[in-house]
Structures are given as structure tokens and as C-alpha cells.
Amino acid sequence: MLISIEGNIATGKSTHFEYIKTLQLDKVYFVDEPVEEWRNIKDKNNMNALECFYNDKKNSFCFQVLAYITRLKKLIDIIKQYPNDIIMSERCIESDKYVFAKMLYESGDISSIEWETYNYWYNCFSEISKVDLIIYISTDPVECLKRVKSRNRNEETSIPLEYLEQCHNKHEEWLNSSSIPVIKIDGQQSIENIRLEINKIMQRLVEPNSLVASRTKPISTAI
């Protein structure tokens, strides 16, 4: 069963994803977002792929293809290794497409032929890494921007509030129209309250009689 942790940039995904790892639940395995892979690919000026994307939108298609390939490879590798267990990923290829790639296509940063090419690749492999449940951490874009500035990552210095607002809206649009079950968590609660919610969710998922014993559709909680 594949569960994806979703949310805007700086919504708290990575923090809570790392917390779930500390619970050391039996037969639960993790797929980190492939950020290090993106940072290891650099241009002739030593700018990594993520920096190139944020600094020049002409690199949009290139980066989205890289994000898709690196994420898909990690997912396929772990699904093959643990086909009957719970796999948790930080984002998925669905959010790559329906949030980030779609947003770039609608803004004109990805051309129509690039969008059609992306969709062809997506459709070829979407069934392999199909998500069974989404845990969505929803945080106001203004708060996300504060967190972006606070963590001060080189690649994110040029991210404006408008981009975070667009990301937020695209997440809401995607998840409200998706057939994938969604559990929504308010990302602006205290970290203690969020962890209490996560603990309850994870305990339900690992119960012996839970539907998650196989990769079938589990708990259905709409946002």
C-alpha cells in the first residue's frame, strides 16, 4: 500500500515525515523526496537542478522530467522490495503532475508539446506507483513563506508568495477532484497536536485487521 504525504512548500511535510519514521512501525517503509538527487545534478556554472528551475523558468520542463524520473525510480525500487507492506512517500507522481507540472503548463512555462510529452510518460507508469491514501498537511501560504525565509535554503531564496498561493490552490483543486482517499491535517496547529493526529492515523493504518494489509483502497476521509 502506498501512502503519500502531501502539502505546499514549507508546509511541514519533511518534519512530520521524519517524525513518522521515529515511530518505528512494523512493516512501514519510507521514500524520501529525491532532493539530494536534484542537488547533485549541476550545470556548467555549478548551479544544481533545483536552483536552475527557481532562477529561470525556461528550465521548467527539464526539472519536472527530472522530478518525475527520480521520484518514480525510488518508488518502483521500494515497491518491488516490499510489495505487501506499507510504503510512505514524501509527495508522489500525482502531485508532480496535478500540482507542479500543471501549474507550469497553465502559466506558459511548459509548452503544449512538453505537456503532452509529460502526460505520455506519466500515463505509461502511473499504475505502477498508484497512491492508495494521501495525508494532506494544509498550511496557509503566508505561513509557508515565513517558514521558507526562516529555513533559508539557497534554492528557495527567489520563491514569492504568489507561487506559494498558486501551489496551495492547485493542491486544493487536485485533492478535491481526486478519487484517492484523503486525510487532511491543519498544518498551523502546534507540532504536538499534529503529532497526536499522526499517531492516531498511523495506529489505524497498522492495525492487524485494517484494510491496509494489501494495496487496496483504505480509510476514506475527504478533505
What are these regions (language model features)?
Residues H16, I20:
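Hydrophobic positions on the alpha1 helix immediately C-terminal to the Walker A/P-loop
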Residues K58-S129:
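Glycine-rich phosphate-binding loop used to anchor ATP phosphates in small-molecule kinases
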Residues N8:
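P-loop (Walker A) phosphate-binding loop of NTP-binding proteins
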Residues I5:
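Hydrophobic anchor at the beta1->P-loop junction of P-loop NTPases
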Residues K13:
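Conserved lysine of the Walker
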Residues K97-N169:
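A glycine- and Lys/Arg-enriched "phosphate-lid" helix/loop adjacent to the NTP-binding pocket
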Residues L145-I223:
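NTP-dependent small-molecule kinase module
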Residues T22-V65, T70:
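Conserved substrate/cofactor phosphate-moiety recognition/catalytic segment
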